[in-house]
């Protein structure tokens, strides 16, 4: 029987790459996304290629929706083994521009979404009578504060703390909790960050990317597949003796 994973924010970008990689690794995958159309498109692509996937619409900031999505995946795909709490938003937020609305939106998705995902996964693992793997999207910005990204960066510091605490709390249940910390990845989300940062600096598109890219030791932007390969490891038995860690997969932007 195939193992089952649910990936949030899997309708595009890093989430889609993770879903495709997990299918390649032998998982049946629930494509969970706020955008129902993109989720269905990714699930269809997987199914047509001979894999097994289902689409589920979810707003990760809504606890009930997250629990319902995980339960739907468990029942439809026949089990539950891994959750990847990947969904997130990253608006440019110079300190003086931060509003209560921006803080609420980012924290509701990036932080609460991870908490609800952790809780829903634990419930599903208990119903299945075994442990499992919880994998959270952090960021290099969750290790080192990034300019112009105060709210996003602080939300990812929070995710790293949640990952460590959950790892300690859930170890007795046979559940590991780890994170992955991308750098600059060629995705629609990064294109929007570049637009906002470039615009705020009064520079042409690409300025933001160029400024951040100066810090990449390997000298290139990340492909979504680079991140998916890291998550593949965290979802596999090879990482069974790892918990509470947030792995940097950023091309050498941050060294710890």
From Swiss-Prot:
It catalyses: (S)-acetoin + NAD(+) = diacetyl + NADH + H(+). Substrate binds at residue 139. Its EC number is 1.1.1.304. SUPFAM superfamilies: NAD(P)-binding Rossmann-fold domains. It comes from Klebsiella pneumoniae. Pfam families: adh_short (PF00106). The keyword Nuclease does not apply. Homotetramer. The lineage of its organism: Bacteria, Pseudomonadati, Pseudomonadota, Gammaproteobacteria, Enterobacterales. NAD(+) binds at residues 6-33, 59, 156. The active site is at residue 152. NCBIfam families: 23BDH, PRK07231.1, PRK08643.1. The keyword Calcium does not apply. It comes from the Bacteria. Catalyzes the reversible reduction of (S)-acetoin to 2,3-butanediol in the presence of NADH. One of its GO terms (biological process) is acetoin catabolic process. GO terms for molecular function: diacetyl reductase ((S)-acetoin forming) (NAD+) activity. Keywords: NAD, Oxidoreductase. This is Diacetyl reductase [(S)-acetoin forming]. Belongs to the short-chain dehydrogenases/reductases (SDR) family. SMART domains: PKS_KR.
């Amino acid at each position: 029987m195939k193992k089952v994973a649910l990936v949030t924010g899997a309708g595009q970008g890093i989430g889609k790459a993770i879903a495709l990689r997990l299918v390649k690794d032998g998982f049946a995958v629930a494509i969970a996304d706020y955008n129902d159309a993109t989720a269905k498109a990714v699930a269809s692509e997987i199914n047509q290629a001979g894999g097994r996937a289902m689409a589920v619409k979810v707003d990760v900031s809504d606890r009930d929706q997250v629990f319902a999505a995980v339960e739907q995946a468990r029942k439809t795909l026949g089990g539950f083994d891994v959750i990847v709490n990947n969904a997130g938003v990253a608006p440019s937020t110079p300190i003086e521009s931060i509003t209560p609305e921006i803080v609420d939106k980012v924290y509701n998705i990036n932080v609460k979404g991870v908490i609800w995902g952790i809780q829903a996964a634990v419930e599903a693992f208990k119903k299945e009578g075994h442990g499992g793997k919880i994998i959270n999207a952090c960021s290099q910005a969750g290790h080192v504060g990034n300019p112009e990204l105060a709210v996003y960066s602080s939300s990812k510091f929070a995710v790293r703390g949640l990952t460590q605490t959950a790892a300690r709390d859930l170890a007795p249940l046979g559940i590991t909790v780890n994170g992955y910390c991308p750098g600059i990845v060629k995705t629609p989300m990064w294109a929007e960050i570049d637009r906002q940062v470039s615009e705020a600096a009064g520079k042409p598109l690409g300025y933001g990317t160029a400024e951040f890219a100066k810090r990449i030791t390997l000298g290139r932007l990340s492909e979504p597949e680079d991140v998916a390969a890291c998550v593949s490891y965290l979802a596999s038995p090879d990482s069974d003796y790892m918990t509470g860690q947030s792995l940097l997969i950023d091309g050498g932007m941050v060294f710890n």
